[in-house]
Design a protein with these regions (language model features):
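Glycine-rich phosphate/pyrophosphate-binding loop
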Residues: 45-49, 188-225, 232
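Catalytic beta-strand/loop cores that center a nucleophilic Ser/Cys/Thr
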Residues: 208-263
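Conserved small/polar residues in nucleotide/adenosyl-binding loops
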Residues: 296-302
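Flexible inter-domain linker/hinge segments
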Residues: 1-58, 67-74, 104
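Phosphate-binding active sites in nucleotide-utilizing proteins
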Residues: 58-131
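Cysteine-nucleophile active-site neighborhood
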Residues: 108-203, 209-211, 280, 286-294
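General small-molecule cofactor/ligand-binding pocket signal
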Residues: 2, 91-95, 247
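A glycine-centered loop/beta-turn motif at secondary-structure junctions
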Residues: 259-282, 286-289
């Protein structure tokens, strides 16, 4: 008889099963050799850190599917894993972007150590995401934008720094005069459903010395994608001359994959989904760096944050 007891974290389940010798029973039933005792020390160390954090930090996850947090399950787990590396518990605050505007953004996000603007599709809630980006940028709060979150960062910068007040993505407004986010030219004639999706893993070259390169510890990475729209490189010179840099690009196509604002404590947007590659054994370096700098921001005197 094997007990399936409640545990504080799902990551402890294999340890509980091992203590009851369930692994040996399964191997025996399958007539497989069980000569070597498994080394679960790294998993045990991870679980110990998850269960006994030295501190807690509050990070906002701004999205439009927040009524169902499992929509962001991969991001949530990435924060658990990155938190363990930093000896802290990340308390996620799910903030519905449809309910954010200029009048309440400070109330909703002002006490956060970091702000993540989540992926998604479509126009609903987009202005709230852009408002959250603006708050993070102008209040110098650590920021990570993923996929649509990165695109919102580009749109916000175009509107409020470059002065293109109608700037947006052609996903939201096909007739916009400033399509800073757009379909690639070769995609525009594709009509088959899903045909314009950029899916799977692609290489990315990072600029040496950028915050992204510092987090990864290398300039050559490969990350997974799931999106249709891209940074419009026709605007790249405008962005870079005003302080938003393209620090990651596909080496074959030149498509922009990572943007940063160097004159900010930590402002990073990725077109790809870093959460897809985060694991217990290898927490994603961007999440690890984001959590670390968010904790540093939390400990700064209030007057030093702006």
């Amino acid at each position: 008889v094997m007990e399936s007891i409640d545990v504080p974290t799902i990551y402890e389940v294999p340890l509980v099963m091992h203590r009851q010798h369930l692994d040996e029973v399964v191997l025996s039933k399958l007539d497989l050799p069980s000569e070597q005792e498994p080394d679960l020390s790294s998993l045990q160390a991870f679980v110990d850190k998850v269960k006994n954090p030295k501190r807690t930090i509050d990070i906002a996850l701004v999205g439009k599917y927040t009524e169902l947090p499992d929509a962001y399950k991969s991001i949530c787990e990435s924060f658990i894993q990155a938190g363990a590396v930093n000896d802290c518990k990340v308390k996620l605050h799910y903030v519905n972007s449809e309910k954010i505007d200029a009048s309440n953004v400070g109330e909703k996000l002002g006490k956060m150590a970091g702000i993540l603007v989540a992926p998604g599709f479509g126009n609903r809630g987009i202005e709230g995401k852009i408002e959250a980006v603006h708050f993070a940028r102008t209040h110098r709060i650590p920021f990570l934008g993923i996929c649509l979150g990165m695109q919102c960062a580009v749109i916000e910068f175009a509107r409020n720094v470059l002065g293109f007040k109608d700037a947006t993505s052609t996903e939201m407004d096909p007739a916009t005069k400033h399509p800073v986010i757009d379909l690639m030219e070769e995609q525009k004639g594709i009509t088959a459903k899903g045909g314009t999706m950029r899916l799977g893993a692609y290489p990315c070259s990072l600029v040496p010395g950028s915050k992204a390169a510092q987090a990864y510890g290398t300039t050559q990475i490969q990350e997974r994608h799931r999106h249709r729209y891209e940074f419009n490189s026709e605007y790249l010179k405008d962005f870079e001359s005003h302080g938003m840099k393209a620090v990651g690009a596909n080496p074959d196509t030149g498509l922009v994959e990572v943007v940063e604002i160097p004159d900010h404590p930590w402002f990073v947007g990725t077109q790809y989904h870093p959460e897809y590659k985060s694991t217990v054994q290898r927490p994603h370096p961007l999440f690890v760096a984001f959590v670390a700098v968010s904790y540093t921001h939390l400990t700064l005197p209030t007057t030093s944050r702006v």
